[in-house]
Amino acid sequence: MALLRKINQVLLFLLIVTLCGILYKKVHKGTMLRNEADDDSETPEEMEDEIPVVICAAAGRMGAAMAAINSIYSNTDANILFYVVGLRNTLSRIRKWIEHSKLREINFKIVEFNPVVLKGKIRPDSSRPELLQPLNFVRFYLPLLIHQHEKVIYLDDDVIVQGDIQELYDTTLALGHAAAFSDDCDLPSSQDIHRLVGLQNTYMGYLDYRKKTIKDLGISPSTCSFNPGVIVANMTEWKHQRITKQLEKWMQKNVEENLYSSSLGGGVATSPMLIVFHGKYSTINPLWHIRHLGWNPDTRYSEHFLQEAKLLHWNGRHKPWDFPSVHNDLWESWFVPDPAGIFKLHHPNS
C-alpha cells in the first residue's frame, strides 16, 4: 500500500511538472508578439467590415509609417484597422505620434514584436545592415499578429497609397494560395527602370545557384521574382500550410549554408519567401505596387505613369525623407510632423 501511494505521488508530481511546462511554453510564445489592445472586444459584424493593414514603425524611420498610414486613411472610405508594429522601446512614441497628430481619428492597435523569435535565424553579413532589423521579418509572423481576420494586407513602411485600399483588399487569391504579390516582370515601365539601374528581376539575383541546396530546388534561375513589400494574405491558408515554419526553416538553412545571393541586399527577407511561395501565389494588380523609386536618385518615372499608380514604393537606399531621392514631393505631401520633434526631413529645402 505504501509503495502504491509513493507511485501515485510520483505520477502526480510528473503531471504537475508537465502542466507547468506547457503553461510556460504558451506564455513565452505569447510574449513574442503582444497586442496592446487584446482586451478590445469586437462583434463578428465589425470584424467582417474591417480591412486589417499591418505596417511596421521602426525607431529611426517612424515618419515613414505615419506618412503611409496618412495616405491610406485619406484615400478611402473603408473601415481600416491599422496594426502598427514596433519594438518595446518605441511603443509609447508610436501612440503619442498618432494621438497627438492628424492621425488621431484612425482605428489602430499597437503591437509589440519581440526579436527573440529571430534568435539564431539571421546571418549578420549583409550589404545593407538596415535590412537585418527585426521589424523587417514581421511579415513572416502575420498569423501571430492577426487572430480574428481571414484576410490581411501587409505593407512596407516606405510606401505611399494613392488609390482606395479597398481595391487592394479585394484582390482575389486562388484556391490554395496563402498570399498575393506583384511580379517583378509585370510592367513595361518597370522593365525600363530595371534596365536603367541594372536591377535583377529573377531568382538568380536572390539565390546562390552555386549551392547544391538551391540547385536541388529545381527552380530555374530565370524565374521572375516578386517583391514582398506589398502582400495580401489569407490567414487560414497561411496557417494550414505552416508558412511561418517553412520560412523559418529557410532562414535557418541560410545561417548554416549561406544560400542567398549577395548581388541584391534585399535578399535577406525576400529570398526565403521566393523559395516558400514559388509557384504558389496569386498576383496583385501591377499598379498597386510601383516600386524601385529608391534605387537611383537620377532615375525617374514619367509623371503620367506616377499619376496612374495606386501605390508607390521607395524600396532601395534612397528614401523620400532623405537626400538625394526622387519623387519625394509625392511622399512629402503625406508627411505627418513628429509631435516630439525627433523625426525630421533631410531635404535641401525642408
From Swiss-Prot:
UniProt keywords (A-Z) are: Glycoprotein, Glycosyltransferase, Membrane, Signal-anchor, Transferase, Transmembrane, Transmembrane helix
Provide the primary localization: membrane
**One term under GO cellular component:** membrane
Topological domains annotated Cytoplasmic: 1-6
Subcellular location per UniProt equals: Membrane
Hey, which stretches end up on the Lumenal side?
25-349
TM region positions: 7-24
What's its EC?
2.4.1.-
Q: Name one GO molecular function term.
A: UDP-glycosyltransferase activity
Q: Name one Pfam family in it.
A: Glyco_transf_8
> So which residues have sugars stuck on them?
234
Keyword Membrane attributed:
yes
InterPro entries in the cross-refs: Glyco_trans_8, Glycosyltrans_8_dom-fam, Nucleotide-diphossugar_trans
For membrane topology, the record states:
Single-pass type II membrane protein
Q: Which family does it belong to?
A: Belongs to the glycosyltransferase 8 family.
What is the protein's given name? Glycosyltransferase 8 domain-containing protein 2
Designated gene of the protein: GLT8D2
